[in-house]
Amino acid sequence: LPDTTPRMPRVDAGPVYELRIYAAAEDRLGHLIKRFRDHTDRLFRKHKMEPVAYWLPTDGTAKEKRRFVYILKHPSRYAAYQNWNAFTHDPEWKRGVLEKPEFQRLLSERPESVFLSPQDIPGTFPHSTNPSIFELRTTTVANGKLPDLQAHHRQHTTRLQLKHGMSPRGSWFAYDKPESENTMVTLL
């Protein structure tokens, strides 16, 4: 049936990005990576979720290094809801993946999920098979100062990053309030 439920226009606007952070249980990170390589990535694509980047922390405590971080692109915030609903109800996911013993009890805590709105600061995600180091930066400013931060980033920061050999991969604002009023996320 067609979806005729009235919604706020904002939830149909897009694209939106979703930053997800998984904390793997001890001795389970390898199995989590295998699940993504063998099943999850393909099922994301099947359900209209576009993987933008996957990475692992290189520093921090042993627990912090067991995190698995990724970004998905969705056509809209509402589409993200629909995509996740279809994904979690997919018979291949429920019976073909989650029932395998090697893929059970992979996480030590509930996944973190932050929706992000793109901004007009250049950034690219060129596909590369070369190992790379990425830096995820979250900048929080006083309420009302986010446009100033964006302007400074666009006019100065990006140029300086490129001058010093850093490659901006993307910049986003938090989608949901209250963070959307003062938070910018950047991937270098």
Can you say where each PLM-predicted feature lies in the sequence?
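Short S/T/G/P-rich N-terminal loop/turn motif that feeds into the first structured element of a domain
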Residues: L1-R95, P101-L188
